[in-house]
């Protein structure tokens, strides 16, 4: 893929040259259709964002984003009519993936038939997905060929309102427990109101074991401040507290991919952060958009670049966690 870079950073959109301004100058060829279609209508202070803008974003961010997706089955959220029209979630691409694109076939939960998920292993694949009007990519917590064993643990902090101070405090509490166990904690905005805390795993445990491990950590965090935190799945029972959700730690479940755009006004991005950025005045989990993130990457790089060099085997940590909870 031909992307102009300065200092190792993606700088210049790929498609803004040629007859109609959008020519797919890459091998394999990716045909770009309807680049002027508005996917994000103008709203308040947000200007309209086109399909071409979305494609350009994913092309620019691809060198950073692809390593986080490589080997993971994906689910795509598509909005052919834009975000003000109903979109749909697609997992099975058995009949529509181009020949050159990677894929993984997994058995359906029912045991009847299979699902063919796209797998992003190259920059062109992100451009192809964006051209399918895919705004948001969600990825599994495991990679092939070891789909039964997660390589990351995830805590999804889901607030009841816009009080970010409570979300931030909860995120730091999760990180404190994770780090006390000897693991490394990473943080990402969701592009909405919450945060994801992620800890890389060594792939020695199945999903049930990992989820129970995460559930125990979440229990410690909630017990430390039950007034503001909860494990209650039902929204009606949360009483305005932050839900510390560990249910994504399951086979076939997904989390919003790092650097994915969300289908919300202004095109906010699910953005990996440095921990000190949580304390920046005015910080909002939806505060970074597809307009801002490529420039930010040139200035700060990828906070998750070393994540999988910090992976920990889970087995030795289970006794340590039991002692923390004693």
What are the language-model segments listed below?
Residues 175-189:
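Active-site palm subdomain of RNA-directed nucleic acid polymerases
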Residues 13-16:
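Short polybasic linear motifs
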Residues 189-199:
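Short, conserved phosphate-binding/catalytic loop or strand-edge motifs used
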Residues 77-79, 185-191, 232-236:
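Short beta-strand
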Residues 21-56, 63-66, 70-71, 110-111, ...:
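C-terminal accessory nucleic-acid interaction domains of nucleic acid-metabolism proteins
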Residues 83-135, 140-141, 146:
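Basic, low-complexity intrinsically disordered segments
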Residues 198-210:
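Catalytic palm subdomain of template-directed nucleic-acid polymerases
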């Amino acid at each position: 893929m031909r992307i102009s870079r300065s200092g190792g950073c993606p700088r210049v959109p790929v498609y803004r040259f040629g007859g109609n301004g959008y020519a797919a100058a890459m091998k394999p060829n990716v045909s770009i259709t309807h680049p002027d279609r508005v996917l994000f209508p103008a709203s308040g202070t947000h200007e309209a964002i086109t399909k071409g803008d979305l494609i350009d974003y994913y092309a620019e961010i691809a060198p950073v984003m692809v390593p986080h997706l490589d080997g993971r089955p994906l689910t795509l959220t598509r909005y052919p009519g834009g975000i003000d029209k109903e979109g749909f979630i697609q997992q099975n691409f058995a009949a529509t993936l181009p020949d050159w694109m990677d894929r993984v076939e997994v058995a359906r939960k029912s045991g009847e038939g299979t699902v063919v998920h796209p797998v992003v292993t190259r920059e062109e694949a992100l451009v192809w997905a964006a051209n399918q009007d895919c705004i948001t990519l969600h990825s599994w917590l495991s990679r092939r060929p070891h789909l039964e064993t997660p390589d990351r643990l995830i805590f999804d902090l889901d607030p009841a309102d816009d009080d970010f101070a409570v979300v931030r405090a909860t995120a730091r509490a999760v990180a404190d427990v994770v780090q006390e166990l000897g693991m490394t904690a990473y943080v990402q905005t969701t592009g909405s109101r919450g945060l994801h805390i992620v800890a890389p795993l060594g792939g020695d445990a199945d999903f049930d074991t990992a989820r129970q491990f995460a559930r125990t950590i979440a229990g410690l965090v909630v017990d430390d401040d039950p007034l503001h935190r909860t494990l209650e799945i039902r929204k009606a029972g949360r009483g305005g507290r932050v839900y510390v959700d560990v249910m994504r730690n399951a086979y076939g479940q997904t989390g919003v991919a790092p650097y994915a755009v969300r289908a919300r006004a202004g095109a906010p991005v699910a953005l990996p952060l440095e921990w000190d950025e949580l304390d920046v005045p005015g910080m909002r989990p939806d505060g970074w958009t597809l307009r801002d993130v490529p420039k930010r990457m040139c200035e700060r790089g990828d906070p998750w670049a070393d994540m999988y060099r910090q992976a920990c085997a889970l087995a030795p940590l289970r006794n340590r966690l039991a002692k923390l909870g004693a």
